[in-house]
Amino acid sequence: AQYAGEFGPDALAIRHALQFPPEVVRRETTSGRWNDETVTAYLRRWAREAPDAIAAEAPGYPPLMFAQALDKSERFAAALAVRGIRRGDVVMVQLPSGPDFLIAYYAAARLGAVLSTLHMPYGPVEAEPLLRHARARAVICGPATEKLDLPAMYKALQAGLPKLDHVISVGPARHGVLSFADLVASGDCAALSGEPRADDPVLMCYTSGTSAAPKAVPHSTQSMLANPRACAPIYKLAPGDRVLSAPPFSHAFGIYIANLTLMSGATLICVPAFTPPSLAELLEQSRPTHAFLAPAHVAAMLHAGLLEGRDLSGLRLMIISGSYTAPGLKAAIEVELPNGKAIELWGMTETFAVLMGDPDEPAELRHGFIGRATPGSETRIADSEGRVLPAGEEGELEVRGCSVFAGYFDNEAANAGTFTADGWLRTGDLAVMNARGHVRMTGRLKDIINRGGVKFNPFDVEALIDRHPAVLQCAIVPMPDRVLGERACCFATVRPGKSLTLADVTGWLAQHQVAKLKWPERLETIDAMPLTPTRKIIKGELMKLLTARSS
């Protein structure tokens, strides 16, 4: 009722999903972790204090200065306002990481709209249900290419999406598609009224959907900014620093990096598209002081020898996150960083970064664990009955803190069981914590295989098979069995020129003294793993493939 006059019905529904428990609001506001600072406030600060400093740059784009970023984003926000986009409305963006994406993001934040993201590989099958579920009022996309005509795709979808009023493209205006550049140029800031509020929804990302359909995760400005603000001192970021973000801005991790860089007054180096050679070259040529990468980025460059002989002397800190980090990866990349260290970050779309390595800790801690709870976050390990476990015992990681979301939008089934009775988020990840709070991931609850009543976690077995000389990537999934209930099937992609048999796999595991009950009893080789846009293996797709091949 408090917001009924300020939000439309659909926007009000998203606002309703952001109802944090009163004790959470009290805890975070009293601590000062939640305050009134907004994305717009940070952008205005640096536009005022360092107008000609570079806010963002990307290959193929002119540099974007802080003053330009503020001016263009406010003009674009005004153009959206004139076209009926109001506070709480969803604006969906399908753009590569770069200045255009940031202008759209800053504009939505200034307007009080909710930014929702679509990954670049998405076509109509993936985009349509998310646009419908989000009740998107506008979508901003790239130009037509030989591979996919995004503006035409969205115009075709618009006929079946009555909420979708506007299709905006960074390409030329055509067929009822508005031009992003024209809107930025014509926007009149006099059309803007009011200021964004820090407790309003500002971002709604969809989970990667490794085992189920994507779920919508709304965040307020407070829950979105509290975490990078608390973590900034650990990174030792300052104006003049240069931050490379390989994770795409369509992912919550990419937005986290963009916010961290903005509030620090540093320069954001964007990566519009990833190939191992181009990323290796950008790491050298752009001279970052900090680089955020996914494990797949690092592993691909190391495997191909693409970093050998490159001058990475200016890189002080490499932060690895986004999926499972193989043992030895952080130590291996540090060999290429004469003046830098590698740490790991762990989080979820629902939480942002809640575990983080400390660059000032010894290598054995940085390399052997993800890290400890970030400032403003708490972690614990619980068993299947919800009992909190002592140090050293494996159980489910549970978290709470300043950046944990309030619940999924329009998905009561997903919300059921997400939080414990005392308000901790159940992550679904298995982990072990030592006496000092350092956490090491050991698997996913959903990946547990129940072989005749004996349950085992395939996580460590997968990590070992990944080290086989013939294996590029592997994943173990359960397969139905009439006698035992479940057995284990290993899917693997094989290195060029190599071959792999089940006997090779089991022999490798025997050589490394893995208990036979954990050995896979079937091997399926495939050309490529089904991956989310953030390069996580979609085990649900592998199980469908297994069913199809079995039948």
List each model region and its residues:
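Conserved pre-ATP/AMP-binding loop-to-beta segment of ANL
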Residues: 36, 51-52, 169, 175, ...
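Structural core segment of the AMP-binding/adenylate-forming
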Residues: 1-9, 82-83, 113-182, 496-498
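AMP-binding/adenylate-forming catalytic core of the ANL superfamily
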Residues: 122-132, 139-141, 291, 401, ...
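Conserved AMP-binding/adenylate-forming core of the ANL superfamily
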Residues: 35, 44, 52-106, 123-128, ...
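Conserved AMP-binding A3 loop
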Residues: 63-67, 202-226
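Conserved ATP/PPi-binding loop(s) of AMP-dependent carboxylate-activating enzymes
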Residues: 372-376, 387-418, 456
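Conserved AMP-binding/adenylation subdomain of ANL enzymes
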Residues: 112, 225-242, 250-290, 304
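Gly/Ser/Thr-rich phosphate-binding loop
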Residues: 263, 288-293, 302-365, 378
